[in-house]
Every structure is written in C-alpha cells, then in structure tokens.
C-alpha cells in the first residue's frame, strides 16, 4: 500500500471501501503508523446530507462529522500491513462532544490517535477542528473483520 503523502481522494479510495457520496475524507496530510493520522474534509454546499443549524444556516450534521472522523481513523488502522485485507467496523463512540456547527466553505482538519490497538479491536481518540477550533471530539471503538470468504 502506497502511503506517500499527501494521499488524495483516489489513494483514499484504494484503502477504504467507501465511495461517493459516503466517502467523507478528501485528503490525508500527516501519518505515523500505529500512532496518528491527520485528514481533511472540505465541506461544500453541494453535500447531499446538509441540514440546518439553529440559525437557519446549512450545516454538516454531527453524525456525518463523526463518520468522517471514523473514516480517517480507519485509514490509520488499515495502513498496518497485517490489516490490509481486513474491514473495520465502527463499534461504538464514547465521550463525544459537539462544540459548534460546521458550515459549507469550512475546511475540517481531522486527527485520530491510537489509544489501544489489539489484533481485532481498538480504541481511537478523534478530534476535528475548523481554523484550529475544536468542533467535535471523542473516542471510538472499532472491530476488524476478515474480508476473506470461508
């Protein structure tokens, strides 16, 4: 797996099974195997899943933002050679805090850090920021399944 930075949308498609409109990561800018990763999500007015915040402005729903954080974390986990043929499953979220809405035109910087990694399960801490300000943070549990058919 080629992890020459920055990873663009096409390189990310070779790692994750997600496709448009559910692939929520546009670019990977930083990567340390088994430690941390930083990705970018550019929020556009053309997003299919925009909702409206309390002020009537278009906003990215918090659940979609959480999924974007999980996808960045999945790239970190799948980059490990022994996980190339595995499929990550989002198993749970803990202590998630949504700080402020994310609007079209925002560039979301997403960081995921490994807290614990075992052969089939793990825990990541994720933080998303816009202009250096935290917009969401929390920990995510994931499980790894095999893609081979028995």
Predicted segments with their positions:
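Short aromatic-glycine motifs in intrinsically disordered, low-complexity regions
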Residues: 7-19
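HotDog/MaoC-like acyl-thioester-processing domains
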Residues: 2-5, 17, 33, 102-106, ...
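Catalytic strand-loop segment that frames the active site of acyl-thioester-processing enzymes
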Residues: 20-60
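Compact, glycine-rich, soluble single-domain proteins
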Residues: 52-77, 90
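Hydrophobic beta-strand-centered segment that forms part of the acyl-chain substrate-binding groove
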Residues: 2-6, 73-111, 135-143
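Beta-strand-rich interaction surfaces with strong enrichment in secreted/lumenal proteins
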Residues: 13, 56, 98-100
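Conserved positions in beta-strands of structured domains
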Residues: 26-29, 94, 99, 111-115, ...
């Amino acid at each position: 797996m080629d992890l020459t930075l920055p990873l663009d949308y096409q390189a990310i498609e070779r790692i994750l099974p997600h496709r448009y409109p559910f692939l929520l990561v546009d670019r990977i800018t930083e990567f340390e195997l088994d430690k941390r990763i930083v990705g970018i999500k550019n929020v556009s007015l053309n997003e299919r899943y925009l909702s409206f915040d309390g002020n009537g402005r278009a906003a990215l729903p918090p659940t979609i933002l959480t999924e974007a954080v999980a996808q960045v974390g999945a790239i970190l986990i799948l980059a490990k050679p022994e996980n190339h043929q595995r499929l990550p499953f989002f198993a749970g979220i803990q202590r998630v805090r949504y700080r402020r809405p994310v609007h079209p035109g925002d560039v979301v910087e997403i960081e995921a850090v490994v807290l614990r990694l075992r052969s089939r399960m793990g825990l990541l801490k994720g933080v998303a920021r816009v202009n250096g300000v935290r917009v969401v943070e929390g920990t995510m549990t994931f499980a790894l399944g095999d893609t081979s058919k028995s």
